């Protein structure tokens, strides 16, 4: 019984480790690949990156991130800053 529990725990730990290794961000790996490219290939690679980076910067309007109001809007006591 104890051996079975240890095997399950080891398998779970291994799965969690593999999941954490594979779920890393795509950007650091790809930026490392950009550094390895030849100078003439970099311009084409960066041109392909710009739409992806622009999409990444755009905020989802359904889940906005607000900070405390700085008095920038007409309702200065609303608690949410309209500049964010």
UniProtKB/Swiss-Prot annotation:
MF annotations from Gene Ontology: hormone activity
Signal peptide: 1-24
GO BP terms: defense response to bacterium; intracellular iron ion homeostasis; negative regulation of iron ion transmembrane transport
GO cellular component annotations of the record: extracellular space
Disulfide cysteine pairs (residue numbers): 69-72, 70-78, 73-81
Cleaved propeptide residues: 25-54
Primary location group: secreted
Protein purpose: Liver-produced hormone that constitutes the main circulating regulator of iron absorption and distribution across tissues. Acts by promoting endocytosis and degradation of ferroportin/SLC40A1, leading to the retention of iron in iron-exporting cells and decreased flow of iron into plasma. Controls the major flows of iron into plasma: absorption of dietary iron in the intestine, recycling of iron by macrophages, which phagocytose old erythrocytes and other cells, and mobilization of stored iron from hepatocytes.
Family to which the UniProt record says this protein belongs: Belongs to the hepcidin family.
Protein name: Hepcidin
Gene (name only): HAMP
